[in-house]
């Protein structure tokens, strides 16, 4: 593992945490969290697989300046697509199965795939970055939910009432599994 990959992992974790919805922290069931992040990881791997070859084509033809434009267009198209799907669910089910946080998290997959699409990385190194980051966030969220359950039992302790503190703790906890894997691989 190179310093470049370590930097990518840190950036990925920061980007993922930026799009972690406050609803994720309120989820008390770890099975629901695992399902949600399994969907997010699989979707990100599909997007990454499609984007990798396009990115390499841009790099080969010295057109990398077009990547941010492509990125922004893709973000807006995905957000619109998820909004339309959400509206369809509301029409047919009278309620939405997917929150705005879920849609934001899915659109953020584009962001993390572009961090994984570093031109110095091979295809499988990028996959490794995505999987490590998603696993780190999932482990962190599961740790947070278990910590929160313990704090909820004692109403006198209100340490985790502040949203920024949650996200800071998630960031620190999400880096721990990645750092352990990096040290083990070296």
UniProtKB/Swiss-Prot annotation:
Compartmental location: Cell membrane
Source organism (scientific name): Borreliella burgdorferi (strain ATCC 35210 / DSM 4680 / CIP 102532 / B31)
UniProt keyword annotations, A-Z: Cell membrane, Membrane, Transmembrane, Transmembrane helix
GO cellular component terms given for this protein: plasma membrane
Name of this protein: Uncharacterized protein BB_0073
Lineage: Bacteria, Pseudomonadati, Spirochaetota, Spirochaetia, Spirochaetales
Transmembrane segments: 5-25, 39-59, 62-82, 122-142
Predominant localisation class: membrane
Residue ranges that the Swiss-Prot or TrEMBL entry lists as coiled coil: none
Membrane disposition: Multi-pass membrane protein
